């Protein structure tokens, strides 16, 4: 699959699947595009031109070490849109990918067809309690230092309900293990992972949410405990602040609902795309 040298200073790796109205999938912190296979690329590519990327510094997207910001990642993506001539485009942003999607919609109005904020947030201002501070959570840094990056990611996926509910992990251990292997294969290294964590927590767009002037779907699992359980209240608070947005709570799934219940997720997304 191709790479493109961008003026923003990154050799960006991307993949395309299917034909139709374009959709870009933006994954969570530190992950390469591999996590979108087979779900939901397989389902969405039946009717859409699906684009996935390794963001700068992750997987096969090469660039020099540098300070990272959400608006910088968004600029990379917009230049990719220019090269591929794919606008207007549906943006699906999972976790940190939702922050990138918000930045795309705010800074490049008219280029985004619709925005799906999947288990995401707009910044620390929508987080409850002590997590409202604009810095990485103390517990995250402690776990990362104590366990190391690989064990930190493995533990979140295989042991906690951070990505999958206890019920799903017990019933589908093979699916969970395969997701872990896929997620780790081209995962960010320690320096780049920390850059993304810092960029995620430095980002704040909560005060700008009322200025979003496009269709916005907010998806969150009822059992999403990732990030200390902040995604569920953050999703509700974003829905209150984004005019005309639609909030969909997916019962019985956690942060990784794309992979925990791919059929239900694809059905919701296809219904949204048909309407927008």
Identify the function of each model-found stretch.
Residues 244-276:
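Catalytic active-site module of serine/aspartate enzymes centered on a nucleophile-bearing elbow/loop
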Residues 223-229:
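Acidic catalytic loop of the alpha/beta-hydrolase fold
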Residues 152-208:
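Conserved alpha/beta-hydrolase catalytic His-Asp/Glu region
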Residues 212, 218-220:
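Short beta-strand/loop motif that positions the catalytic acidic residue
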Residues 6-62:
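Conserved HGGG/HGGXW glycine-rich cap/lid loop of the alpha/beta-hydrolase fold
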Residues 51-92, 267:
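Active-site loop/oxyanion-hole signature of alpha/beta-hydrolase fold enzymes
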Residues 106, 113-148:
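Flexible "cap/lid" loop of the alpha/beta hydrolase fold
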Residues 93, 97, 101:
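Gly/Ala-rich beta-loop-alpha elbow adjacent to hydrolase catalytic centers
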């Amino acid at each position: 699959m191709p790479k493109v040298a961008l003026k923003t200073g990154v050799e960006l790796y991307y993949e395309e699947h299917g034909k139709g109205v374009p959709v870009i999938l933006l994954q969570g912190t530190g992950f390469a595009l591999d996590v979108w296979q087979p779900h939901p690329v397989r389902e969405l590519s039946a009717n859409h031109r699906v684009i996935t990327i390794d963001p700068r510094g992750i997987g096969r997207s090469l660039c020099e070490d540098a300070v990272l910001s959400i608006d910088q990642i968004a600029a990379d993506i917009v230049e990719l849109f220019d090269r591929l001539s794919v606008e207007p485009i549906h943006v699906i942003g999972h976790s940190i990918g939702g922050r990138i999607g918000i930045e795309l919609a705010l800074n490049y109005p008219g280029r985004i067809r619709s925005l799906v904020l999947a288990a995401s947030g707009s910044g620390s201002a929508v987080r409850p309690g002590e997590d409202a501070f604009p810095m990485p959570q103390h517990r995250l840094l402690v776990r990362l230092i104590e366990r190391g990056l690989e064990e930190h990611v493995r533990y979140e996926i295989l042991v906690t309900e951070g990505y999958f509910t206890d019920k799903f992990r017990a019933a589908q251990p093979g699916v969970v293990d395969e997701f872990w292997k896929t997620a780790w294969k081209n995962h960010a290294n320690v320096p780049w992972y920390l850059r993304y964590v810092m960029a995620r927590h430095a980002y704040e767009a909560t005060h700008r949410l009322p200025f979003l002037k496009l269709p916005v779907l907010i998806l969150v699992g009822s059992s999403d405990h990732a990030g200390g359980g902040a995604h569920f209240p953050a999703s509700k608070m974003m829905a209150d602040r984004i005019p005309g947005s639609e909030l969909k709570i997916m019962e019985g799934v956690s942060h990784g609902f794309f992979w925990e219940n791919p059929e239900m997720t694809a059905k919701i997304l296809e219904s949204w795309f048909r309407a927008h």
